[in-house]
Amino acid sequence: MFSKQDQIQGYDDALLAAMNAEEQRQEDHIELIASENYTSKRVMQAQGSGLTNKYAEGYPGKRYYGGCEHVDKVEALAIERAKQLFGADYANVQPHSGSSANGAVYLALLQAGDTILGMSLAHGGHLTHGAKVSSSGKLYNAVQYGIDTNTGLIDYDEVERLAVEHKPKMIVAGFSAYSKTLDFPRFRAIADKVGALLFVDMAHVAGLVAAGLYPNPIPFADVVTTTTHKTLRGPRGGLILAKSNEEIEKKLNAAVFPGAQGGPLMHVIAAKAVCFKEALEPGFKAYQQQVIENAQAMAQVFIDRGYDVVSGGTDNHLFLVSLIRQGLTGKDADAALGRAHITVNKNAVPNDPQSPFVTSGLRIGTPAVTTRGFKVAQCVALAGWICDILDNLGDADVEADVAKNVAALCADFPVYR
């Protein structure tokens, strides 16, 4: 029998030390990885609840196990809030991740060997959009589109040309490193021209979409997926959305369970429900507006300091800095910034001469720092410190000076007060 007073402390101190060290790292490092954010304590409370004990294969009202009357209410709340938040007619809250949500979409609507047209990983797409190392590139005939390297914008004429040439069963619109606004009506028109399904992966911008600050793909796409973390600021998980289409809804449900997953993670679904409720609050739009303003201000600092920002700026929460002209690598820049307690990620840029393990760029995002309370003034200062380190890469004195500034800023803006 377990006791309600059981604690990790004193039972598994090695694990607790690692957990505490990570929590401290989050407090005393500045987080600029575009896909990371901080959840509320309410989200954490749901994830740490007794719901983790309950198996609930199936869907609300149609379970394969008994005792699901309460978790049915939990999942129903999450579904209804997701639909309300994004203006969707259908929502599946069970996918364990964004990648599993994408995999379920492919399983539901494609046959092995079908052609998909997605954005190249090297140009800002995601692994699950047809990269050769991913199952999406192994199970399906993946054709890749990219950006115009002169403008840094998606070349929609190329997308259309490739669609006409290859006749894909599905066109995938979405990204992991693209800072401009996707043209969903154009994607829809191209899909209709060749008789393709349009699948939008809005994982990175879901929070902006929910706040009405980025175009909503639901009216244009046959199916939409997202993660529930990143800009949405919830637990790590996936979500599938669609407008009303009974045939597609049945296929999607069957693809998630039993097609791709067994029992849903009810504690995570509860945390998703909390996240959606938080995103429906009026203050969420102000947060997302600040995310965009902070990203735009930071991008301008890099431009003013002589760095190339891919696409010339940003419309959303992230931007890419190319270091090719400076002769620097993303790997070295990432490491130097890490020593100053600034966390970013190295990232490939268009026409990158380096390998994906080295790269010539950095991806920078503002969701996490905005959650801490950073405004434009703090983000401008932060971008300047990053440029100082890049201008003097490997200079320990510069790194130490920046680290002191970072420590002071983190102390002024704790993650959890």
From Swiss-Prot:
Signal peptide: none
Catalytic activity annotation: (6R)-5,10-methylene-5,6,7,8-tetrahydrofolate + glycine + H2O = (6S)-5,6,7,8-tetrahydrofolate + L-serine
Enzyme nomenclature, EC number: 2.1.2.1
Pathway assigned to this chain's UniProt record: One-carbon metabolism; tetrahydrofolate interconversion; Amino-acid biosynthesis; glycine biosynthesis; glycine from L-serine: step 1/1
Origin: domain of life: Bacteria
Leading EC class: transferase
Residues with N6-(pyridoxal phosphate)lysine modification: 230
GO cellular component: cytosol
CDD domains listed in its UniProt record: SHMT (cd00378)
A Pfam family that the UniProt record links to this protein: SHMT
Cofactor requirements of the protein: pyridoxal 5'-phosphate
Keywords per UniProt: Amino-acid biosynthesis, Cytoplasm, One-carbon metabolism, Pyridoxal phosphate, Transferase
Subcellular location: Cytoplasm
Annotated residues for binding of (6S)-5,6,7,8-tetrahydrofolate: 121, 125-127, 355-357
InterPro entries membership: PyrdxlP-dep_Trfase (IPR015424), PyrdxlP-dep_Trfase_major (IPR015421), PyrdxlP-dep_Trfase_small (IPR015422), Ser_HO-MeTrfase (IPR001085), Ser_HO-MeTrfase-like (IPR049943), Ser_HO-MeTrfase_PLP_BS (IPR019798), SHMT-like_dom (IPR039429)
GO molecular function: glycine hydroxymethyltransferase activity; pyridoxal phosphate binding
Residues carrying the site annotation Plays an important role in substrate specificity: 229
Biological processes annotated in GO: glycine biosynthetic process from serine; tetrahydrofolate interconversion
Record's function text: Catalyzes the reversible interconversion of serine and glycine with tetrahydrofolate (THF) serving as the one-carbon carrier. This reaction serves as the major source of one-carbon groups required for the biosynthesis of purines, thymidylate, methionine, and other important biomolecules. Also exhibits THF-independent aldolase activity toward beta-hydroxyamino acids, producing glycine and aldehydes, via a retro-aldol mechanism.
Record HAMAP family: SHMT (MF_00051)
Record's subunit section: Homodimer.
Family the entry assigns: Belongs to the SHMT family.
Annotated protein name in UniProt: Serine hydroxymethyltransferase 1
Organism from which the protein derives: Pseudomonas putida (strain ATCC 47054 / DSM 6125 / CFBP 8728 / NCIMB 11950 / KT2440)
